[in-house]
């Protein structure tokens, strides 16, 4: 907070006391901060670090502490209205704060939906809309903060989507693509559909690409997805295009051209659009963020260092659904696993300091010496990561087919071939005549 010299401005000391806008002058990013005192449980910031660190503070809240420094009055008083919010100190918990306005009626209402710790009951997520309607009848000033409502909606959608996937039959998958899907591929597609945002880390050769395409097609069939953005290495752009066209018959657009031309192409109507990592990174310097229905990231191991420009760019693509593909075993380096997991669920393994302390062993120099508690970690990631090896699904795979393709040589290759053939013929003749080859000949 001291180093970045953040700018602090009050929203409205009379109408919204204790609420501030904190601006980072370098990035021009603005954050909403609620400050009720140095160690108040009611402090809040809209930044990513506050939501995931579980510390109850961040550099923007610390900037408020520096700004006040005992010289200005801190608005410690809480609003009179009741509100539903997310407590980020132990993961994410939806809670209610009961204000002084009509407090007894709100306490009675809360008993039906919240537990003794004022946390939303698991069974109440499905009926949260009923609670909101009753709460607004009690007090027009009642608030449900956007992040809390979004989380409730997310939980409900996950439940509804899981029920839909469980009801899918084999005929739904048989008609999905212009090819037959193997049982393990259907399993991977169902996994990705249920998760919403997932990592498919199958061994190379098991058809991760086709699983991602089939997942997108099933979501499009359900009208949950309208457009899909595929991010991949430059060398794979047209391979993705051919595969999508071959298996779906849908229109595919490869985003190319100069910076301004590419930025316009994100608004196209094609169901599938493809962009390279480097182009996306450059485009987001101008666009700041991109909104898509579904995101597919191929060769995600290239994003293992989350401080690179490309990795940061991938995190600025906002998508309702995502499938991340990796052909390398992420469990070999837990630091990379943590980085990739942030692309599908920023809260799954965070905060990093707790993750590192729990699962990574360091030597006296601070370097990684080994890992621990891996069974526990496996349980944590199995809701969003699936990995199969060829030996695991060997019985489901077709028999190996070998095809010989004869390709004519180019002129340059023919010249090199003829030179090599001449040298070989000389050596053969010498051997047939003398039955001896010198060391120079043998090399």
List the model feature ranges, each with a label.
Residues 1-42, 67:
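Hydrophobic, aromatic-enriched, well-ordered structural segments
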Residues 12-14, 72-198, 224, 242, ...:
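Charged, low-complexity
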Residues 28-79:
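Short Cys/His-based metal-binding microdomains
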Residues 192, 203, 328:
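P-loop (Walker A) phosphate-binding loop of NTP-binding proteins
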Residues 199-206, 211-242, 321:
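Conserved SF1/SF2 helicase motif Ia
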Residues 221-227, 242, 246-249, 268-269, ...:
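Conserved P-loop NTPase motor "coupling/switch" region that bridges the ATPase
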Residues 254-262, 277-282, 302-308:
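Conserved helicase motor
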Residues 364, 390-443:
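Inter-lobe connector of SF1/SF2 helicase motors
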């Amino acid at each position: 907070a001291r180093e970045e010299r953040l700018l602090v401005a009050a929203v409205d000391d009379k109408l919204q006391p204790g609420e501030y806008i904190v601006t980072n002058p370098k990035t021009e990013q603005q954050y909403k901060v609620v400050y009720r005192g140095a160690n108040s449980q009611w402090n809040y910031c809209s930044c990513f670090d506050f939501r995931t660190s579980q510390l109850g503070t961040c550099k923007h809240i610390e900037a408020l502490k520096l700004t006040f420094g005992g010289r200005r009055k801190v608005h410690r008083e809480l609003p009179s209205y009741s509100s539903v919010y997310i407590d980020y100190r132990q993961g994410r918990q939806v809670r209610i704060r009961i204000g002084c306005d009509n407090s007894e009626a709100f306490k009675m209402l809360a008993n039906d939906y919240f537990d003794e710790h004022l946390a939303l009951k698991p069974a109440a997520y499905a009926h949260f809309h009923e609670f909101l309607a009753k709460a607004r009848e009690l007090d027009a000033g009642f608030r449900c903060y956007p992040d809390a409502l979004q989380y409730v909606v997310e939980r409900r959608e996950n439940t509804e989507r899981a029920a839909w996937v469980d009801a899918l039959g084999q005929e739904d998958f048989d008609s999905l693509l212009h090819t037959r899907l193997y049982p393990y591929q259907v399993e991977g597609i169902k996994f990705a559909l249920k998760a919403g945002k997932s990592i498919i880390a199958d061994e190379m050769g098991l058809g991760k690409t086709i699983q991602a395409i089939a997942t997108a097609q099933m979501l499009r069939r359900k009208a949950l997805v309208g457009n899909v953005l595929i991010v991949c290495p430059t060398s794979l752009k047209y391979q993705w295009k051919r595969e999508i066209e071959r298996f779906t018959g849908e229109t595919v657009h490869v985003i190319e051209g100069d910076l301004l031309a590419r930025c316009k192409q994100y608004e196209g109507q094609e169901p599938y659009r493809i962009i390279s990592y480097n182009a996306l990174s450059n485009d987001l310097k101008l666009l700041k963020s991109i909104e898509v229905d579904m995101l597919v990231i191929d060769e995600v191991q290239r994003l293992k260092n989350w401080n690179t420009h490309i990795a940061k760019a991938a995190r600025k693509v906002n998508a309702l659904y995502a499938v991340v593909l990796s052909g390398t075993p992420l469990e070999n380096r837990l630091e990379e696993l943590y980085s990739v997991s942030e692309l599908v669920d920023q809260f799954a393994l965070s905060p990093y300091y707790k993750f590192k302390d729990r699962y990574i062993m360091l030597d006296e120099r601070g370097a990684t010496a080994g890992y621990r508690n891996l069974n526990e970690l496996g349980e944590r990631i199995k809701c969003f990561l699936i990995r199969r090896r060829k030996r695991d699904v060997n019985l489901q795979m077709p028999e190996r087919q070998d095809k010989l393709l004869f390709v004519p040589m180019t002129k340059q290759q023919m010249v090199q071939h003829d030179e090599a053939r001449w040298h070989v013929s000389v050596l053969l003749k010498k051997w047939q005549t003398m039955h001896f080859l010198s060391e120079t000949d043998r090399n």
